């Protein structure tokens, strides 16, 4: 049987990091097994579902590179199908109409709690065979088996058994004419031929209810894999403050999509001690059965390390558009400075994120207006005009502006003055960037451009008072 997985988010908010990991594992499992990956939008919560959330989910999936073979399929476009299946269960005596008011349902639950029993529906309408009538309280309930046990072998958690006596007759159609979650997902997964349901372990309690519906319909029951949650760095549940952010906030923070994919893959799954995986390695090695049954902790330091690895090793040209995105966010005209790929080469050993890279790169895209006072006192003092002047002379004489030629010119200036390279580089570094810290001096000067570099040297000479 062909493996078919699905990712089925509810569009009530953005795609957070836990949802992204679920989508990734579903995608990897399908791709690893040569199967199909389906995207379904579970939008039957009409009060909370929004088009903005749908757009955000689709944008995040595209950014992560998680392409789907079918979809997006919207539950709201399948209401007639859910009604058809509910009618089938009613006709077979496997479901029934119930009309209790909210007050009556509350009284049932309070009575159960008074007996120290689980608060739930008591099955009052189960055997009454009440006909359909126009009533604002009308629901359809599923006749859950009264005896026996639901048993399933979870691909991650192992064997799980739930007694049917623990389950009540749940609502499968609400008064508003919309299906409930537990009913709609069964019909969807059945119709879509889903063979593996991979989701968070907050759904484990739903699984026995859903299995009973599959069996009532005579539908094949898929395999289930329930992943443990992701905890924050202190071992508590993730919050927006501690990492449960919109996936696109990771883009804005300067992480590469494939770095985040690599990190998320390892957040609960492993292959020996290997930390870094190409996409092909993930596709070859991933098996949902190898996912750890214990909760994983978010580690932002490790994510930073993984991201820096890809900043260092990726083709600079492939990183350049993402650096330009970060620069534009800072209000920078990227046409007013060096090629972004050259900036990547200069800075990628010094940063962990593209956001950091962009912040450091601003100096080459805007006029230099501020200087670090300590750097000026130390390196733009009287006497510094000599190496600066010689460097300017050599740079101005270059026929072609390249890193190699800039380097040769600066070394020639140092040699002409019989100075160590540092005596030329440090005042020049302050002249070009206003600080004592920058990449290799040849790259630093090159990125300023011929005209920009000469103007900055002239400004530094004025500062020294030796123009």
UniProtKB/Swiss-Prot annotation:
A motif ('HIGH' region) lies at residues 9-19. Monomer. NCBIfam families: gltX_bact. The gene is gltX. It comes from Xanthomonas campestris pv. campestris (strain B100). One of its GO terms (cellular component) is cytosol. This is Glutamate--tRNA ligase. One of its GO terms (molecular function) is glutamate-tRNA ligase activity. HAMAP family: Glu_tRNA_synth_type1 (MF_00022). Pfam families: Anticodon_2, tRNA-synt_1c. GO terms for biological process: glutamyl-tRNA aminoacylation. It is found in: Cytoplasm.
């Amino acid at each position: 049987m062909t493996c078919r997985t699905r990712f089925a988010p509810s569009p009530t908010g953005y795609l957070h990091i836990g949802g992204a990991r679920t989508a990734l594992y579903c995608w990897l499992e399908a791709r690893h097994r040569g199967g199909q990956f389906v995207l379904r939008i579970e939008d039957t919560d009409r009060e909370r579902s929004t088009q903005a959330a749908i757009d955000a989910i689709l944008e995040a999936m595209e950014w992560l590179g998680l392409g789907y073979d079918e979809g997006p399929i919207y539950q709201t476009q399948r209401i007639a199908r859910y009604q058809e299946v509910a009618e089938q269960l009613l006709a077979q005596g496997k479901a029934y109409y119930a009309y209790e008011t909210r007050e009556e349902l509350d009284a049932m639950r309070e009575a159960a709690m008074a007996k120290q029993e689980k608060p739930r529906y008591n099955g009052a309408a189960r055997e009454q065979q009440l006909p359909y009538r126009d009533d604002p309280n009308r629901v359809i309930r599923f006749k859950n088996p009264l005896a026996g046990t639901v048993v399933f072998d979870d691909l991650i958690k192992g064997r799980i058994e739930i007694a049917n006596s623990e389950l009540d007759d749940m609502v499968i159609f609400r008064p508003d004419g919309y299906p409930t979650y537990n009913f709609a997902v069964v019909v969807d997964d059945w119709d879509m031929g889903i063979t593996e349901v991979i989701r968070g372990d907050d759904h484990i309690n739903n699984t026995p209810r859903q299995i009973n519906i599959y069996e009532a319909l005579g539908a094949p029951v898929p395999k289930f894999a329930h992943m443990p949650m992701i905890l924050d760095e202190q071992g508590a549940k993730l919050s927006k403050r501690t990492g449960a952010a919109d996936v696109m906030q990771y883009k804005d923070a300067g992480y590469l999509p494939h770095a985040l994919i690599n990190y998320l893959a390892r957040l609960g799954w492993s292959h020996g001690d290997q930390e870094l995986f190409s996409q092909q390695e993930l596709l070859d090695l991933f098996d949902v059965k190898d996912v750890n049954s214990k909760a994983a902790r978010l580690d932002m330091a490790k994510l930073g390390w993984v991201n820096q690895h890809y900043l260092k090793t990726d083709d600079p040209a492939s990183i350049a558009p993402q650096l330009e995105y970060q620069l534009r966010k800072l209000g920078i005209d990227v046409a007013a400075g060096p090629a972004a790929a050259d900036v990547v080469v200069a800075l990628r050993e010094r940063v962990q994120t593209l956001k950091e890279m962009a912040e450091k790169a601003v100096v080459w895209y805007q006029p230099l207006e501020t200087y670090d006072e300590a750097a000026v006192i130390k390196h733009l003092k009287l006497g510094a005009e000599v190496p600066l002047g010689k460097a300017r002379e050599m740079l101005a004489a270059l026929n072609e502006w390249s890193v190699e030629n800039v380097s040769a010119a600066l070394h020639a200036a140092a040699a002409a003055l019989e100075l160590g390279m540092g005596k030329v580089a440090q005042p020049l570094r302050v002249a070009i960037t206003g600080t004592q810290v920058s990449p290799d001096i040849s790259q630093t000067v090159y990125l300023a451009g011929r005209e920009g570099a000469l103007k900055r040297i002239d400004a530094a000479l004025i500062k020294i008072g030796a123009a």
